[in-house]
């Protein structure tokens, strides 16, 4: 009786008083010194399982938890002391390894459990399926599904939710939806998992269908945030902002995913005032601006032309990661602040933030817009040798654009011909644009020929060559290029523009007189034209 009471007391201590792994070690030492492991096997098993269970409860969230060899070696040694592990014991050690992001070990223990003919229960399969989701292990997941059906666990919401998650992670969205559709019970996680699967698969219409079918009372911040992120990622910015307006009407709490998605849409749509209101909400709610939100705010204000505000937010943020630096650099590049951009790049390097391909894309674009040719040459040359960043087609395209704009057509052509990969439409198009600017017909013809090979349906190249021939007064060639365009039945894609009237953003194309707001649009455009004329 005394040993039994000691055993019970120590289990209570483990559950209620252990606040660190060190405390667990201390209780474990007491169990050994008091000889409690020599008790009846079932009592010893309860104690050892309680140790593992308490260990699991002390593990921090997965992103903050790199697997540590001491952790799982200790857990293994404790588990191996259990003579006849019960289903609960096996479930506990399997869960330990999913929590430690060691899914292979979790599956190993599950296999050992089945080999010993220990029956699974409703908790076993969710833990194993979490391991499958971490590994994108489709074949094992299918086996688990069969076993779940055999043991009658497919009615369990946790089994179904985790099975849907595995299928979504493996890109089997059809199988995922089938499990979701046939599930007897659904909770908010059920909807959020399949919604996330559709969003990641860029099936935004099906995602919206699930969202609309979901009871409003069941939706949580994750539901709304996932849907908003889906719209932002698939460039359905107007739908994103419309859905956000619904959130405001329903007083739905915002999470960071929602805020970032809406700021992204506002930046793309030029919705400065709406984005400012989102920023005001962040201030009123006293939401801490971490690197995630800092990046979104800097990107939004930069895209809307409010560079000083973007700078202020960036400088005030104590947590500047690579993405925040890139947002600041790209924002400066977009608006031609070349010298300032280079200063920020120097600060970034001094702060030991390693640049990546996006960083150099922003730097090269900024140098191109500001005409900083020598600086661009130097940094382009240092990408691989100094910073270890491989040059991609987009970087060569930026250099081609910079050199061609500056009239260095020969240098641009030599660079393109020496590239380790074939040029794409962007690279050759940059060269062609420079040729039009500087009237180099010979190189323009070579660039145009390559573009026609790569993208025969591109109508813009014919228009550009027509302009080049017209400027050079080569009327016969102008006639030939137009006939070639007509014979190939190539049409130039109409460009579109965006304009705001009374707070509403409208999209239109040149010469559009069918738009319901065409009169108001052209009045605004005329006013812009007059203002530009007055400003010189």
Model-assigned labels for residue ranges:
Residues 1-96, 100, 104-187, 196-216, ...:
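Terminal (and in a subset, N-terminal) low-complexity or junction segments at the ends
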